[in-house]
């Protein structure tokens, strides 16, 4: 849906924002879709209370909105990068993973988990955190990331890989349960 919106009705706004070194639509979409994804993952590991799932959703959404704040605080013509929003986002981003880890460790015998769970979860965790490293490279202006568009394309690929990975994890979790 997001990619349709930016390619058709919001294309001019999207391209104008990219020229300014900011993409608010990305961060709003991530705040929603990434939070849905982490909630689905949470459910797979036994988190079923509404307050627990709302907490995971909310703190994950805040993490993504801190990505938007990072962009707003650091326009392309800056002389110095303010990393505050980025590193507060790391803290917020790890909280849902810590909660999932607690549930995973309380599962009991991890050998009873389906074969795909631990490798899939590890890969998804890696991809999830590559978003933050992409932002570091982009705002530190390292190599190809000096060009905002390169970082933007990296976000698109990471999003595709992350969503596909989680879709397979959820699908396998449903089919094999």
Indicate residue ranges for each PLM-predicted region.
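Polytopic alpha-helical membrane-helix bundles and their juxtamembrane interface segments
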Residues: 1-25, 34-177
């Amino acid at each position: 849906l997001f990619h349709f919106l930016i390619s058709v009705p919001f294309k001019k706004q999207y391209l104008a924002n990219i020229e300014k070194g900011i993409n608010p639509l990305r961060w709003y979409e991530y705040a929603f879709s990434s939070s849905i994804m982490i909630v689905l993952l949470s459910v797979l590991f036994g988190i079923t209370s509404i307050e627990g799932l709302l907490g995971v959703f909310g703190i994950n959404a805040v993490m993504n909105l801190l990505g938007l704040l990072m962009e707003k605080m650091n326009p392309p013509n800056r002389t110095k990068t303010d990393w505050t929003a980025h590193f507060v986002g790391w803290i917020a981003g790890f909280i849902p993973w810590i909660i999932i880890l607690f549930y995973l460790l309380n599962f009991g015998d991890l050998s009873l988990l389906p074969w795909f769970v631990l490798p899939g979860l590890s890969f998804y965790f890696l991809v999830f955190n590559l978003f933050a490293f992409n932002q570091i490279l982009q705002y530190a202006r390292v190599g190809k990331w000096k060009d905002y568009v390169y970082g933007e394309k990296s976000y698109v690929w990471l999003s595709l890989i992350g969503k596909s990975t989680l879709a397979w994890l959820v699908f396998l979790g449903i089919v094999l349960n």
